[in-house]
Amino acid sequence: MPKSLKIAHIVRRYTPAEWGGTETVVRHTVAEQRALGHDPRIFCTAALQPPDARPSDDIQFFPYFYPYFPMPTADRLKLDKKGGSPYSPALFKAVRDFRPDVIHIHAGGRLACAAVKLAGRLDVPSVMSLHGGAADVPASEMAEMLRPLKGKFPYGSVVDRLLGMRFDPIARVDAVVCISHTEEDRLKERYPGRSIHYLPNGVALPEMRADAGKADSLRNRPRPLRVLCVSRIDYQKNQLALVELLARRPDCSLTLVGPVTAQWYADKIEARVQELGTGDRFKLVPGLPPGSAELEAAFAAADVFVLPSVHEPFGIVALEAMARGIPLIAANIGGLPDFVHDGENGMLFEPADADALARAYDRLAALPAEGLARLTSAARATAESYSWPEIVSRLMRIYSECRNGA
């Protein structure tokens, strides 16, 4: 591999106001690649960007559109937030002018197909990261993401055929990066002979401030146990399960922090809280920038962190809670059981079982101080093995294998 590589990262959306796992991964990957002496750039649509958004050395934003008619603003915004498959010709002209050595795709659909075709024309390898999963997206979640397209004329299907973009990008890229062993296994079965790699997300350890006193405060609390969930307010994240827990366990309070990507679901949460009469122990904060003082304060105040998702390809925020020494309860789904081991460094529960979350909560609350200390110590040790420098070093080896085989 040359000493310095020009790396084009293709991203569908990138905005602190609507942050998520993909943005976190790309941000840290680019920072580590720059530290290694490479030249990474982020090429992104202008989805969710304010009109005065300005490019930087790391990122450029480009016009885009969804090829459906009609496309009212409300539906475009829903697609921007989740599930959209846009065209962005200007984005790929800029990538072509950049002349990258590697194209790293962090999107699916039309952006992925266009990136694969451009990599072929430039004779450079393409790597595709499946941040949102591909083999294990629930049918109900897929249907909800596609709801804004209902009743619209898909003129893009004609354009796709004319441009030769009706193909499966996973079958054409030089390497696929999965963030869970479950998806890795399924894709290797579905795409035999393809270069498919398990590469987990990382955690920015220097930014974490582990609180060794969490176990003591949990055992000797003169107040309700403070439960925190930081994730998008979205049906995928299953925060309604936490609202039900709040009603069943009067010894806890609940704070939800995250950008609202499904307004109807946020409304449903608020309505259920009012119906249950638990508003005095509930708070919803619709999004805090990563690294902000307010977000750090929310983590610092938490006694327990819960991630109850029904679909979770990885779950970076669970690692962040573990690194901070916050006792963790997580759904036994997707990439979470790859690093959360029940009873050892956290508690797992089956999200399809209505009573399982309450049982996991009770198991955690019943642990003696020594047991909680062991749990959080093991959690911090787990998080330390997911440092970004190590993860990006492994990614660069994947690039090297692709370039050597190109």
Predicted regions and their residues:
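A conserved mid-protein helix/loop that constitutes part of the nucleotide-sugar donor-binding site
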Residues: 24, 225, 229-248, 267
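Membrane-proximal helix-turn-helix segments that form the acceptor-binding/catalytic region
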Residues: 121, 134, 152-175
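Carbohydrate-associated surface elements
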Residues: 182, 202
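Nucleotide-activated donor-binding/catalytic signature segment of Leloir-type glycosyltransferases, i.e.
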Residues: 267-289
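Short alpha-helical donor nucleotide-sugar binding micro-motif in glycosyltransferases
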Residues: 287, 297-302
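Aromatic "clamp/platform" in nucleotide-sugar-dependent glycosyltransferases that forms part
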Residues: 310
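Short hydrophobic beta-strand element within catalytic cores of glycosyltransferases
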Residues: 327-330, 340
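Conserved acidic donor-binding segment of nucleotide-sugar-dependent glycosyltransferases
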Residues: 342-343, 347-354, 363-369
